[in-house]
Amino acid sequence: MGRYWAVIPAAGVGRRMGGGDRPKQYRLLLGRPVIGWALERLLGHPKVAGAVVALAADDPHWDALGLDRQVAGKPVHRVEGGAERRDSVRAALAYLGGIANPEDRVLVHDAVRPCLSAAELDRLIDEGGAAVDGALLATPVRDTLKRADGDCVGATVSREGLWQAQTPQLFPLRRLSAALDAALAAGVAVTDEAQAVEWHDGQPRLVTGEAGNLKITHQADLDLAAAVLTAQRAATEREQTA
């Protein structure tokens, strides 16, 4: 089994967040930028060798963070991202092609998911590390789903068998590269890496995630993430003193 590399697509602007003078991955969360939390959660794992972060060409915020060299004693490499998530991930994979081994695997993670727990990452690597088509964290859909008809309910949708995809999403480096390249060549627009592998005749494995692994999309999510991180820190302190 090869090494694991973190890939963080972070070239987006995140306009839905509203307010502030910076993209949501650079907003402060408990005194630190959101992307800093995301990197630390991945690079703190002993099996993760380093990270590649894909940034906008004119990103004015990254250099001020001082993350270009190391996080948790591991290298952080920077590449220029693209207009879409898939373009940024492909750029990061191309960079890894020059420094990684053919059997290495990648953990593609949203820059705005700062609350990934060590237990989740362990579970993803343990259950999905050997999967030929990769694996992803996901949670079963719990709420009743409605399909809209204008501003009214058009139908109730069965949630049986439905899961909500999260990140990280874990794949063999070569498998994901081939899937993304093929999707691009065919003009298929994919919204996450698992969809590219699905389209490329694969079946990524679902690994149960946690509700706390939330994605920062709106201002209220920052407050919720702060509560999750505070609770995680308290739990760790209790374990250390037990």
Curated annotation (Swiss-Prot):
Keywords: Isoprene biosynthesis, Nucleotidyltransferase, Transferase. The keyword Nucleotidyltransferase applies. InterPro entries: IspD, IspD/TarI, IspD/TarI_cytidylyltransf_bact, ISPD_synthase_CS, Nucleotide-diphossugar_trans. GO terms for molecular function: 2-C-methyl-D-erythritol 4-phosphate cytidylyltransferase activity. Its EC number is 2.7.7.60. It catalyses: 2-C-methyl-D-erythritol 4-phosphate + CTP + H(+) = 4-CDP-2-C-methyl-D-erythritol + diphosphate. The keyword Nucleotidyltransferase applies. Pathway: Isoprenoid biosynthesis; isopentenyl diphosphate biosynthesis via DXP pathway; isopentenyl diphosphate from 1-deoxy-D-xylulose 5-phosphate: step 2/6. Signal peptide: none annotated. GO terms for biological process: isopentenyl diphosphate biosynthetic process, methylerythritol 4-phosphate pathway. PANTHER family: 2-C-METHYL-D-ERYTHRITOL 4-PHOSPHATE CYTIDYLYLTRANSFERASE, CHLOROPLASTIC. NCBIfam families: ispD (TIGR00453). This is 2-C-methyl-D-erythritol 4-phosphate cytidylyltransferase.
